[in-house]
Amino acid sequence: MPEFSDKQIQSHTPMMQQYLRIKAEHADMLLFYRMGDFYELFFEDAKRSAQLLDISLTARGQSNGEPIPMAGVPYHAVENYLARLVNMGESVAICEQIGDPATSKGPVERKVVRIVTPGTVTDESLLAEKRQNLLVAICPLNPKQPEAEYAISSLELSSGRFWLTKAHSSEQLAAEMQRLEPAELLYPESISLAGLPLAKAKCKRRPAWEFEQQTAFMLLTRQFGTQHLEGFGIKNNEPTLAAAGAILHYVKETQRAALPHIQALITEHPQDAIILDAATRRNLELQQSMGEGDTHLSAVLDKTVSAMGSRQFQRWLQRPIRNHQELNQRYDAVDALKENLNFENIQLTLKQLADIERIVARVGLRSARPKDFARLRDSLAKIPEVRASLSHRSLSYLHDIIEPFPEVVDLLTKAVIEQPPLLIRDGGVIAEGYDKELDELRDLATGATDYLKQLEQRERERSGIATLKVGYNRVHGYFIEVSRQSSEAVPDDYQRRQTLKNTERYIIPELKEHEDKVLNAQARSLAREKWLYDQLFEHLLPQVTALQKSASGLAQLDTLCCFARLADNYRYCRPQLQKETSLIELEAARHPVIEQLSDEPFIANPMSLTPQQRMLMITGPNMGGKSTYMRQAALIVILAHMGCYVPADKAIIGDIDRIFTRIGASDDLASGRSTFMVEMTETANILHNATAKSLVLMDEIGRGTSTYDGLSLAWSCADYLSRQLQCLTLFATHYFELTELAEELPATVNVHVDAKEHGDTIAFLHKVSPGAASQSFGLQVAKLAGVPEHVIHKAKQKLSELEHTHHGGLNEPKQATMELTPPPEAIPSHTEKRNPLLDELEQLDINDLTPKQALDILYQWQQKQKGSTQS
């Protein structure tokens, strides 16, 4: 939108002058400007909204001799349009008429009453019920070294949860962004966001002064009503406060209301949870599938029945904790909920509850709607039923958190009708009998039916018109209606109010006097009802903290019931946690997602990673199950640190601080990085940041480059992980030379995934056994994948040659053989004499070679060339 000087603004109509001044204060967002029954948009806002919302673009008046573009949406449907805009990442300022048109001279007074942004929405229609909607702020702790350390703060305005943490590197910052998935991100104008996974976030540059520590301290202490922040475990001079202060400033600016539901700031220390970097979260498919469909862990294992419970499940999944005392408390609760299928009855009740957490937040913001009050009342009425199921001592802490609120239930039962309308402006929300004055006004406004019937009968007799009727509509008010034929017989005091095709409508002084009384009573009745509605907020605000606490308890209970259901339905076992050492010992472990989605019975496998056996070198064919075996170990560790039972017959898990994965291969085209560059970047991150307490998953390291380079890198990485870092490592490879490391490296053991050959086919047993694989089955897998028969045949011929002429070198198991019929096509002959190696090179299909086959061919050619040179 073009900027206007004061002189240019003066050249517009008074209404447009008002619009331009308000728009200048909200230049970076769409302005919904209330005009009667519509919210209108002008200039560039109109063009943009017409494109985004597919609404008509018209014009109104002129500016600098050009028509002013205009678009609009009806006020009664505004929430639907807001939802669409927010989902597109747009921010909208809502400008309402606050003056009385009847008494206004010039334009009706207007002002922006709220600002809707992707990270600050609280309306039910604008939120995904099972996902957190986070506003996040970041800032460097040292402006001179902007990539050293970062303060990170996040706020879920729809619940009041407010967190503060720190990232010690740009890699940790990227991991936090992957974990939090912010709907909106605030950052100081002094830094760049390049390289962060923020595709879904609306990023907003903010002035540097909003990130000043002293400003933050003042805002936070004022919000919490304290003189310092030590009660929250935060030092008054804590540098990370800057990010929290920026969030609070932004929310106050957008909401333009008190924030009583934001009661505390929680500090999260990275060392208190298992750290999962961005690549690990992606590779393990915790909350997003890498393929099609909802096959990620969250989609498959989330058996909660309430929106609150589902969001709690996500929070525990995003941040698996290391506090064994708290984890064992959750295990105990799951065990108690499993008894007599107690979770079944509890979840039947929880399923009937509304989203108390978000309703309470709207109460705090004074934006709750009549239906919110009704659903809060009905949900709180069921809490005693829930608490009655929590008598077991392992559930007593939840019993104490989840309080009953009989006074609130009683208040809302008396005050709000059973099924109230959507908005208070429609009236009819406050129940009859709650307020004597309101009842009297309603009687005056609606209790005159008998009077109108009597008036109608009198006027029929007075006029002699038997079909005369007394009626009412919202446009013309009360009227007396007669047919066109009878209009000549009306008395002289009848004043025509409206002419229709076949009827005439009139008003008389007596009816006009009644209309004034009724309309006045209706206006007073609605005003009284709105006042009473506001008083409900005053009654409920002191209960907000306790209500939030109970809502949190209900969310935890639902998630624990989900864990109990998983344990009961799928034979999960209780993990045994050990603090003394880092280890993972599993008996009959399964992959929690594949087990549920596969039509075939899942083959369980053991795993042992201990101080005496820290690295497993895993070999076997593609599709054999190596990646599944590795991933299920990581997922079991994560589930155990959520407080969930795990898919195994027995699980002993030691102290794990981080999980790393180097799995899969793909280009990062957006950043201009090749497959190999992505692979090496992730590998470097592991080698720099893994500790002796870390679990590392390495799959096919080195395959993105030449055979010698790849083998050398894989060998060296395995050596470093084993000798230097001494972390728990699962190392899958097709370089069979690496199996020799079991004899060279300490605490390294070979295991393999079994497969059996049946004629021309291969059966994958998915069973993990000790020792290195005996065959690689590369040609059989290629055939299963649909590689053309003549290509398989050529590969078979070349493999046979290589196996007969192999001289020394590193040891590799032979390829399994297949009896294949030669294709009918003849190989063209060359009459001219030339180096036979060139013939072999022309016939070679490099796309169908494994790295090891390529290495062997190169070796063989080298030997042939040396022999021919010597002769």
Swiss-Prot record:
SMART domains in the record: MUTSac, MUTSd
Highest taxon, organism lineage: Bacteria
GO molecular function, one term: ATP-dependent DNA damage sensor activity
HAMAP family, alphabetized: MutS
Provenance organism: Idiomarina loihiensis (strain ATCC BAA-735 / DSM 15497 / L2-TR)
Name recorded for this polypeptide: DNA mismatch repair protein MutS
GO CC terms, sorted: cytosol
PANTHER family: DNA MISMATCH REPAIR PROTEIN MSH1, MITOCHONDRIAL, DNA MISMATCH REPAIR PROTEIN MUTS FAMILY MEMBER
Keyword Transmembrane: no
Gene Ontology biological process terms in this record: mismatch repair
Record gene name: mutS
